[in-house]
Curated annotation (Swiss-Prot):
This is DNA polymerase IV 1. Poorly processive, error-prone DNA polymerase involved in untargeted mutagenesis. Copies undamaged DNA at stalled replication forks, which arise in vivo from mismatched or misaligned primer ends. These misaligned primers can be extended by PolIV. Exhibits no 3'-5' exonuclease (proofreading) activity. May be involved in translesional synthesis. Transmembrane segments: none annotated. Keywords: Cytoplasm, DNA damage, DNA repair, DNA replication, DNA-binding, DNA-directed DNA polymerase, Magnesium, Metal-binding, Mutator protein, Nucleotidyltransferase, Transferase. The lineage of its organism: Archaea, Methanobacteriati, Methanobacteriota, Stenosarchaea group, Methanomicrobia.
Length: 365
C-alpha cells in the first residue's frame, strides 16, 4: 500500500501580506488589518497583522483600540474582503494543480488562506519528492502572486497541519512517519491540533503535560473521562494517527454577513432589525448563484468581545428569506434568554449549500 503524503499550505499573515504587496512602503512598518464597525475611527477588532506588529503584542481578535495603544505608529487598514477573496481564488487554483489526479477528493480548502492537498500518487509516497513539490508550490505562488506561504508535509492531515506552523513565516517542514515521535512528543499537549483550552486543562489536571504523556496513557482511562469517541481520538492523535480523508463538498461553503450594532444593546427590536438586513444580503447572494441552504448560524459578539455561536440544521434545503428570518429569530431569542452582557456585533451565516431544486412551504420547517 502506497505511503500517504498530505501537504498543508498556510499563507503567511495573508490580508496584511496582500496590503504590503500592494504598497511596498508598508513592509518595514507594523500593519494591522481591522474589521471596523464604523462607530468610530478604530472601533472594531483586529483581523490579522504582520510580524512587525506581532512584536508589539498585537494579535488577531483584539480590539483595534487596544492595538493602537500597543503601537500608536502602526498602520491600520480596513478589511478588503472581495479583493482578498480574488487573490485567494487564484492561489487555490495553483494549489489544485499540485493535488493528485484520479478518483476521490485530493484537495480541501479550509479557509481563505489555507488548504490541504494529497500528493501520494504524484510523489509515490516519497517525502523527499514531497519536499520538492512543496518548494515548487512556494516558488509558483511567489512568482505569480508575490506572497509567501508556510507548508507542512506529513502522512496525514493532523501532522501536516501542525508541521506548517513549525517554521513560519515562509517555511517548509517535512515530518515523515519515522519522525512522528520526535516531532510530536516533546510538544505541550495544548499544541495538538484539535485540542482546545478546556480539554487541555482537563488533561493537565490529569498530569498530562506533553503529547508523549498523552500517548502513554491507557486508552480506557481516556475513554472513561472523555467518552469513547473523544478518548479514542486523543490516544490516536497523540500517536500521530489520523485517517481522515480530504473532502471538498459543495455543502462545505458558507455565506454570511456580520455587522456592528449602532450601540451595545440587548434590545430585541434593534438586533432583529440588523439581522433582517444581514439576512437580506445573504439571500441576495444566494439568489445570484441560485443556491439554497440547510444550516443557519447566528453569531453574537458581546461588549467584552466574547463570541457565541448557535446553529440549526433544517430538514431539507430552502432559499426563503422568511425561513432564514424565522430560524435566526428563534436563535436570537435563545441568546437573549441566556445573556446579560450587551451585544456589540451580530452575524448571520448559512451553510449546507446546494443548487436550488424548488421551494417548499414555510410550514414544512
Amino acid at each position: 500500500m502506497m505511503q500517504r503524503v498530505v501537504l498543508h499550505i498556510d499563507m503567511d499573515y495573508f490580508f496584511a501580506a496582500i496590503e504590503e504587496r500592494e504598497n511596498p512602503e508598508l513592509r518595514e512598518k507594523a500593519v494591522v488589518v481591522c474589521m471596523l464597525s464604523g462607530r468610530s475611527e478604530l472601533s472594531g477588532s483586529v483581523s490579522t497583522c504582520n510580524y512587525v506588529a506581532r512584536e508589539f503584542g498585537i494579535r488577531s481578535g483584539m480590539p483595534c483600540s487596544r492595538a493602537k495603544k500597543l503601537n500608536p505608529e502602526a498602520v491600520f487598514l480596513p478589511v478588503r474582503k472581495d479583493f482578498y477573496t480574488s487573490v485567494s481564488d487564484r492561489i487555490m487554483e495553483i494549489l489544485r494543480s499540485y493535488a493528485d489526479p484520479g478518483n476521490g477528493d485530493s484537495f480541501e480548502q479550509i479557509s481563505v488562506d489555507e488548504a490541504f492537498l494529497e500528493s501520494s500518487e504524484r510523489t509515490g509516497g516519497d517525502f523527499r519528492l514531497a519536499f520538492e513539490v512543496g518548494m515548487q508550490i512556494k516558488k509558483e505562488i511567489k512568482e505569480k502572486e508575490n506572497l509567501t506561504c508556510s507548508i507542512g508535509i506529513g502522512p496525514n492531515k493532523l501532522i501536516s497541519k501542525m508541521a506548517s506552523s513549525a517554521k513560519k513565516p515562509d517555511g517548509i517542514t517535512v515530518v515523515s512517519p519515522q519522525d512522528l515521535e520526535a516531532f510530536l512528543w516533546p510538544l505541550n499537549v495544548s499544541k495538538l491540533w484539535g485540542i482546545g483550552s478546556v480539554t487541555a486543562g482537563k488533561l493537565q489536571e490529569m498530569g498530562i503535560v506533553t503529547v508523549k504523556d498523552l500517548a502513554e496513557r491507557d486508552v480506557i482511562e481516556l475513554i472513561s473521562i472523555f467518552g469513547k469517541s473523544r478518548g479514542t481520538w486523543l490516544k490516536q492523535a497523540a500517536s500521530g494517527i489520523d485517517d481522515s480523508p480530504l473532502k471538498e463538498r459543495d455543502g462545505s461553503e458558507q455565506i454570511g454577513r456580520i455587522a456592528t450594532l449602532p450601540e451595545d444593546s440587548l434590545d430585541k427590536k434593534l438586533i432583529s432589525s440588523l439581522i433582517e438586513r444581514l439576512a437580506g444580503d445573504v439571500i441576495e447572494k444566494l439568489d445570484s448563484r441560485e443556491l439554497s441552504f440547510r444550516i443557519v448560524t447566528v453569531t453574537v459578539i458581546n461588549s467584552n468581545f466574547r463570541m457565541y455561536t448557535k446553529s440549526r440544521t433544517l430538514s431539507h434545503p430552502v432559499s426563503s428569506k422568511e425561513v432564514l428570518l424565522q430560524v435566526s429569530g428563534e436563535i436570537l431569542d435563545e441568546f437573549l434568554s441566556e445573556n446579560r452582557t450587551e451585544f456589540r456585533r451580530v452575524g448571520v451565516r448559512v451553510g449546507g449549500l446546494q443548487k436550488k431544486k424548488g421551494q417548499k412551504s414555510l410550514f414544512d420547517y
